[in-house]
Amino acid sequence: KAEGFPVRAVYEYVMTLLNSNYEDWRKANPTASSDDFKFSCKKLNPAGALFDYAKLCDVSKNEIARLDAAEVYDLALEYAKEFDPDFAAALESDPEYARSILAIGRGGKKPRKDLTTWKDVRPYMAFFYDGLFTPGEFPAQFDGAVVRGILEKFLQTYDPADDAAVWFDKVKALTAEAGFCADMKAYKADPAA
């Protein structure tokens, strides 16, 4: 509980351990109740279940991604009240504002999967709250003047009406202009280029 995994995610994860066909069933039935799954003793792993933390995290990300902003708010607030009272106070100070933040990228065919546990909600939302935000440092491998230059140019091109694709294309163009690779496939093929 203190780690912040949603109860529902832990249940889903355990089901993937118990029955080898549960994960395929869930993919085919993403909104169905797990009670609809036909559990079979024949599908139990004969070697016994092995704990897989990465799998638990993946299941949890998917479970949280299925929730709407109001559900995420309620469950994150419940967690924060017990384990992070300062963050709980920030959430409660303006619930509609918090829900609107949590609604960013939620829903649709490809919902964002930034949150793995309820513990992740504070750092995810911190930059929206003056009292929680801590400015980061530029990564040491990048020249601060170059990073600042990209950010200044970004401010000149920023348009809040841009959709995600237009916004991302602008970011790629600015970074390419500064000498960075704007194509992930090309970068993976030759990171030194």
Give the residues covered by each predicted segment.
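C-terminal accessory/binding modules appended to enzymatic or scaffolding proteins
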Residues: 145-193
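Catalytic adenosine-cofactor/nucleotide-binding cores of aminoacyl-tRNA synthetases and other
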Residues: 1-152, 156
